[in-house]
């Protein structure tokens, strides 16, 4: 990149440097653009040919910058963007920051689920039929999950291959609520099955 910049500046030197003469080419005493010295760019008066002064205008600087940017290898720019993204990915804690306020809510939901779940397990132990029906329903649900369509399996494998775990974070947030709903549905479903058997 430095070589490209030096080449561009060498081309611009012949067009933009002015001769040291006392003649003024403009009738206005004030120049239209502020002249900029080349000394910050590493060019000094000793390196310039005799009779040239190191004054360059803003359009010439802009042309040099745009010419340099235009000749940079695109793969180099893509590599720099990838490096920046990789560095940002290792230090990005936004997902964790989003989970921190949700952790107390999840704890509260789990606390509220625990006692009814223990009561349900005790009832199911006392009633063997309910326990068998519960096993049957859970087996049916498990078999339904195992017989998922290949498209859904392919999509889940694609998600698993990616490094983006936002879906998992959202699932962790929603999973207790889904469990609570299923838990509340289970007892009425068991009651309905018992009524159907007794009739």
Swiss-Prot record:
The segments annotated as topological domain Lumenal are 86-94, 151-168
Question: Could you list the residue ranges forming a coiled coil in this record?
Answer: none
Q: In which tissues is it expressed?
A: Leaves. Not present in stems and roots.
Q: Which InterPro entries does the entry link to? A: PsbY_plant (IPR038760), PSII_PsbY (IPR009388)
Gene coding for it: PSBY
Q: Name one GO molecular function term.
A: manganese ion binding
Pfam families registered for this protein in UniProt? PsbY
Q: List the protein's name.
A: Photosystem II reaction center proteins PsbY, chloroplastic
Q: What factors induce this protein?
A: Photocontrolled. Steady-state concentrations increase for the first 3 hours of illumination and then decline.
What species was this sequence derived from? Spinacia oleracea (Spinach)
In the UniProt record, the transit peptide is located at 1-85
Q: What else is known?
A: The central hydrophobic segment (residues 130-150) does not form a membrane-spanning region but could serve as a targeting signal for processing of the precursor in the thylakoid membrane.
Q: Membrane topology per the record?
A: Multi-pass membrane protein
Known role:
Loosely associated component of the core of photosystem II (PSII), it is not always seen in crystals. PSII is a light-driven water plastoquinone oxidoreductase, using light energy to abstract electrons from H(2)O, generating a proton gradient subsequently used for ATP formation. PsbY-1 and -2 are manganese-binding polypeptides with L-arginine metabolizing enzyme activity. They are a component of the core of photosystem II. They have also a minor catalase-like activity since they cause evolution of oxygen from hydrogen peroxide in a reaction stimulated by manganese.
Q: Name one GO cellular component term.
A: chloroplast thylakoid membrane
Task: Tell me the organism's taxonomic lineage.
Answer: Eukaryota, Viridiplantae, Streptophyta, Embryophyta, Tracheophyta
